[in-house]
C-alpha cells in the first residue's frame, strides 16, 4: 500500500527556478512556523482526509497565530449546516436506515457514483431487522434535474426543473397541509403527480430523505435545506420521517464536529482573537477571503483546494506563501511553496473519524508508513512547538 517509487517521503521546498528541493522535516517545520508567525491573516483550510486528533492540533496553532480555520463544508454542505442551525434537524443513523426505512428519497444526489457503497450497505439492498425483504420491501424515489445512474436504481424518478427545488418542496408541504395547488405544474412536475407523491410519503412506515449537493449548492442553498427539513417535520404528523445530508470527502463531518464542540461553529471559524471564535458566512469563508485578497499565507491540510476552488481564488492564494500537508501529490501541492508529506490516515496511522451520520469511528493502523515519514498529528504538534518558540522571541 502506497509503496510506489514516485511517492514523496521527504518535504519539498520550491526553488527560485520553479523546481523542488528535498529538505529535512526540521527545516520544513521551521519554514512553516515562520510563515505562520509572520502572516497577519493565515487561512488554514482542509481537514478532510485526516483524523480528529490532527484537527485539534491544527486548531491549537490557529489560536496562537490568529488564523482562520475552514473545511470542505464551505464548498459542499455548508448551507446544510446553516439550515440545521436555523431550524434543527430530525435525523438518525445509517444503521436505523438499514433496519427500518421502507421509503428512500435521493434528492439532488447520485450515490451510485459519489457514495458507491451507500446503496448496498444501508439504503436500498441490505436486509435489516424490520426490512427483511431488502430492496423488494422498499420504495425508492429519485428527485433530480437529470437522469442519473441512481435514478436507474429507483422505483420512481421525478425530474424537476433546475433551480426549482424550493418551489417543489413548498408544493409538497402545501398538499400535506391540506391545501390545493392552483398551477397545473410546479417545477416542471404536474400537480397531480405532486399530490400522489405526498400520499406515497404519508403511507411509509419509516422514510428518509438523503439530501445532496444538488440541493445545497443550487439556487436557494440553505433555504432549500430549510424547506426539506421542515418537510420532514410535516411528514412526522403522519408517519416517521428523517433527513440526512449526503456528506462527502472523507472526514469532513469530523471537522465540523471538532470545530463545533471547540468553538461553536462547524466551519469558517475566525480565530484572529485567539479562542474568541467568530463566524460569518461570506466573511470568514475560505473562497470569499481569497477572492477579496485578504489572505497573506495559506496552510492546506489533507485537501486539494486548487482542484475545487474557483480559479480566481486559487490564483489569489498562489500570490502568497502556501504550505500543503498531504501524503499525495495533487493540484495544490504543485502550486505550493512547501509540500510536507505525512502518513496516510486510516492506513498508516490510526485516529478518530466521523461517518456522514455523525457516528465517530476509530480508524486502525494497517501498515507502517515509509521510514522517516511523520504522522500529521506529530507534524502539527512540532509546528506548534516551533511557533511557541518564535512567539516567545518577539
Where are the predicted features?
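Long, C-terminal catalytic modules of enzymes
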Residues: 338, 357-394
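Receiver (REC) domain switch-region micro-motif
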Residues: 44, 104, 209, 298, ...
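Short, surface-exposed amphipathic charged segments that create phosphate/polyanion-binding patches used
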Residues: 83-89, 172-177, 256-263, 338, ...
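Extended redox/cofactor-interaction regions of prokaryotic respiratory oxidoreductases
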Residues: 62-125, 131, 229-334, 343-348
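Active-site phosphate/pyrophosphate-binding segments
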Residues: 167-168, 176-279
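Short glycine-/acidic-enriched loop or helix-start segments at secondary-structure transitions
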Residues: 54-56, 115-117, 152, 219-221, ...
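Short alpha-helices
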Residues: 144-146, 150-182, 213, 221-228, ...
